[in-house]
């Protein structure tokens, strides 16, 4: 790998490369910047995704180039990345699980910029548990301002909090 380095993150050693590769050309944001961002948000992000299988959307040459989705754990992944297996209708996939900042650092190393997780987690026994979150995907349609969508989100929050549920806003940026 070009510009190989070993870094220590979250108590783990990780091989990284091409940290100066620009992943967001419009802003000049590099792989190292994405890695720093993932580390900055780890304390908030990890509890939300812990023990959830993660499908990754990767942009190895930057967001202005071809992307692809990846379910199975990459062959090059460090052995310390926790995994879980899901039997789908036509295939068996071994997914990585995010358990800390080191896994997030590895995800940034492979340019996994979008992280997709289901509404459920694996239990300590390795079996899928019941869903533990609800996602309301609010997208403004034609002629609808983002401000209107935000107002609907506030109404949803009020209703859900009245039901005793904890609300966590998430934006995708798309």
Where are these regions (language model features)?
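Short, structural beta-strand-to-alpha-helix junction motif
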Residues: 30-33
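Hydrophobic/aromatic-lined pockets within catalytic cores
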Residues: 24, 46, 50, 161
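SsDNA-processing nucleotidyl-transfer enzymes
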Residues: 2-13, 35, 40-142, 146, ...
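Short, conserved phosphate-binding/catalytic loop or strand-edge motifs used
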Residues: 171-174
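Generic non-transmembrane alpha-helical segments
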Residues: 155-163
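Acidic, metal-coordinating catalytic segment for phosphate/diphosphate chemistry
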Residues: 15-27
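A short linear hydrophobic-aromatic micro-motif
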Residues: 164-169
